[in-house]
Design a protein with these regions (language model features):
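C-terminal hydrophobic helical "lid"/dimerization subdomain
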Residues: 1-2, 274, 323-373
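Glycine-rich beta-strand-centered segment in the early N-terminal region that forms part
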Residues: 32-46, 59-111, 116, 124, ...
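A short acidic, Gly/Pro-enriched loop at the edge of an enzyme's catalytic core
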Residues: 254-263
Length: 373
């Protein structure tokens, strides 16, 4: 067991601003030793994603207290079985990307090449445990729940081997961290589901970390136009700076009657999905990656889908197999075609995590990184 420092969400649904209500406290936590199929990782950096905020504001109800953070990278310090050499392709000292849905590799969902989220992995995430059901985080013997098998807003984490993908050392920690959620999710939706043809356009609704990752991934395709849609002018300007060919607010894109064969919704609000559906061209695909509250509903014309041969597809974790797809993103980044670092707005200290949640909720940041090194 070691003592670590971590950002623990104590209660759900605290009023804003979080800088005053302070629902997350940075505290000393006991971290148990890793078990056989687990790793101890020293966290270097962790990104602040809307899926963290959704736990804080109660849109996605999870058990508390929970140590948040699910987009992180760090260095492997120890294996659960005590070995120090290579194990399943990972060595002590390797930099690993932590991914927020472990794939068990054995269930029927795991046989779908990434299209369906792993069943035991999803069950563990919902229960706030590691894959296999364990909880390694405690405070005075009381359990602290894991966030999506990672809990990366901390100096160290114990994760299942299936939650870690090694990357070469030339991939810096801030790039590695973003590969684990924003890039895998937004980029994976483009590579694995949208896969635009030359001459087609890709529209992205919602230009936060996930949507911007979809934008930069779509820009890696030759002869593909990229359209960014967000309600905030600053986000439209940021997407243009990254190379988006056209940008619009939801009202502007509706008024202009624009249609695209591949449309990605990365907001997590029903109005944004309605915008995305209306933007989809005949024969096209609306790919939804946003995570609204479970009670959210949208209004759709079924006839529109049939008469125009359109489809609506949900994509979790970018429909990715992380061990297959993270190297694809690393290769694009190394070729200079995927500017992942451009998604970083600022670095914050662990103690400023409540303020970081306010910035994310206000829409004033793309990706903030919590620096733990
Ligand atoms: N499917 C997955 O595996 C997965 C993984 C990570 C995140 N997510 C979800 O993806 C969504 C985006 O995450 P993020 O971290 O990029 O969030 P974010 O808060 O950084 O970005 C959301 C963006 O949407 C914009 N927006 C809000 N309402 C809008 C509207 N009606 N129309 C157009 N734009 C609007 C905001 O201005 C903001 O720029 C969240 O719901 C998150 O929980 C899903
Ligand atoms: Zn995320
Ligand atoms: Zn599985």
């Amino acid at each position: 067991m070691i003592q670590i420092q971590g950002a623990v969400l104590e209660r759900i649904g605290a009023p804003r601003p979080y800088s005053e209500s302070r629902p997350i406290s940075v505290v000393d936590v006991e971290l148990d030793d890793p078990r056989d199929d687990e790793l101890l990782v020293r966290i270097e950096t962790a990104g602040v994603c809307h899926s963290d905020l959704s736990v804080v504001d109660g849109n996605r109800v999870r058990p508390v207290p929970m140590l948040l953070g699910h987009e992180a990278a760090g260095i492997v310090e120890r294996f659960g079985d005590g070995s120090t050499a290579e194990r399943d392709g990972v060595r002590v000292g390797d930099r690993v990307v932590l991914v927020f849905l472990p794939r068990c590799g054995h269930c029927t969902a795991c046989a779908t090449e990434g299209l369906t989220p792993c069943e035991p992995g999803s069950a563990a995430n919902n229960a706030g445990t590691l894959l296999g059901g364990g909880i390694r985080l405690h405070r005075h013997r009381d359990p602290i729940y894991h966030h999506l098998g990672v809990s990366g807003f901390a100096t160290h984490a114990v994760v299942n081997r299936a939650s870690a993908v090694p990357v070469p050392r030339d991939v810096p920690p801030h790039v590695a961290a973003l590969l684990g959620c924003a890039v895998l999710t937004g980029g994976g939706a483009v590579l694995n589901v949208g896969d635009p043809r030359p001459g087609q356009s890709v529209a992205v609704v919602g230009l936060g970390g996930v949507g911007m990752a979809a934008v930069i991934t779509a820009l890696t395709y030759r002869d593909v136009r990229v359209i960014g849609v967000d309600q905030l002018p600053e986000k439209l300007a940021a997407a243009q700076a990254l190379g988006a060919h056209e940008t619009y607010t939801p009202a502007q894109v509706a008024a202009a009657g624009i249609k695209a064969p591949v449309v990605i919704e990365a907001v997590g609000h029903p109005a944004a999905l309605e915008t995305a559906v209306a933007l989809t061209a005949p024969g096209g695909r609306t790919i939804t990656v946003g995570l609204p509250p479970p009670t959210a509903r949208i209004s759709l014309s079924p006839l529109g889908f049939v008469a125009e041969g359109r489809s609506l597809i949900g994509s979790y974790l970018g429909s990715a197999v992380p061990s297959r797809d993270i190297p694809r993103f690393v290769a694009l980044w190394r070729e200079g075609r995927l500017p992942v670092e451009a998604l970083v707005s600022s670095s914050v200290r662990l103690g400023d995590i409540n303020e970081a949640m306010d910035h994310l909720a206000d829409g004033t940041a793309v990706r903030q990184l919590v620096d733990l090194a």
